[in-house]
């Protein structure tokens, strides 16, 4: 991956549909075309269908956008590429209003484009968290559509979060001592997800989906965690202490998440909370590489 350039430089590199299609072809078939049906290496570019190749052996037609959020979209590839660049490199994200202004498209198109890109930010085959992981739950505010001035239609939604705790000196997993300062540690990767409630079933499902078996879990001592017998459980009783003192890193993540949602989108919508969480996880996990864009 190459360091991101300015939008103008990026647009120069991907100024035409052909350059975007050539990039996608190279990423899909770095060693040359291979038919997904028969494995043959001979194909012809169709004139009747954009960016589509037909296998000369079996006749299977395959587009360079197949399996991506761009497939069967009526938008030019250049718009997809420019929008991806903006959303990947902008420090706080891009709202639909900003994409509308930057790309010269309608608000509806910008909104749909942003939603599809957010859904694609999470790799379904990503590696689970491991080592030492802080886990906790928090409530974040949301608002329904067009309810900015209507508190009746606003509320809070429960989310679960997990964050790796890393030693600053060795970059290895390090369990933080109770009541110890966290200046000698840093946060690693995170995971966030909306959950229905604080029940053992909801919390265990979140942990098993996002944290590797055998990992040390630092928690607030909630009664739902002891059922995770195949994890090392290190409960930190909160008692009268604030949660951010006992579990500093996950509560720092929660605080940043709330501030980001309010600052960038002026509040999160309940209906699309999963896509917003995906985007925040994406940005947090690549916070040291936020100027990295599409490979050149």
Q: Where are the model-predicted features located?
A:
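Residue-level recognition of single "structural anchor" positions
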Residues: 1-296
């Amino acid at each position: 991956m190459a360091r991101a350039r300015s939008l103008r430089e990026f647009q120069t590199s991907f100024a035409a549909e052909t350059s975007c299609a050539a990039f996608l072809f190279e990423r899909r078939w770095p060693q040359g075309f291979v038919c997904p049906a028969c494995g043959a290496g001979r194909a012809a570019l169709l004139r009747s269908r954009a960016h589509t190749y037909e296998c000369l052996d079996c006749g299977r037609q395959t587009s360079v956008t197949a399996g991506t959020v761009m497939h069967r979209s009526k938008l030019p590839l250049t718009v997809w590429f420019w929008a991806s660049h903006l959303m990947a490199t902008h420090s706080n994200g891009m709202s639909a209003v900003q994409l509308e202004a930057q790309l010269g498209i309608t608000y509806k198109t910008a909104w749909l484009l942003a939603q599809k890109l957010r859904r694609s930010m999470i790799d379904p085959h990503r590696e689970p968290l491991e080592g030492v992981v802080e886990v906790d739950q928090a409530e974040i505010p949301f608002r329904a559509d067009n309810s900015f001035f209507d508190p009746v239609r606003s509320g809070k939604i429960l989310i679960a979060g997990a964050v790796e705790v890393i030693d600053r000196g060795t970059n290895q997993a390090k369990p933080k001592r109770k009541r110890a300062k966290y200046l000698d540690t840093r946060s690693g990767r995170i995971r966030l997800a909306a959950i229905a409630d604080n029940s053992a079933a909801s919390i265990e499902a979140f942990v098993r989906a996002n944290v590797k078996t055998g990992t040390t879990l630092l928690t607030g001592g909630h009664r739902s965690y002891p059922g995770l017998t195949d994890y090392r459980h290190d409960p930190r009783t909160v008692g009268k202490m604030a949660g951010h003192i006992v579990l500093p890193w996950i509560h720092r993540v929660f605080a940043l998440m709330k501030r980001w949602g309010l600052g960038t989108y002026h509040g999160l919508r309940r209906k699309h909370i999963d896509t917003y969480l995906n985007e925040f996880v994406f940005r947090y996990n690549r916070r040291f590489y936020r100027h990295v864009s599409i490979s050149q």
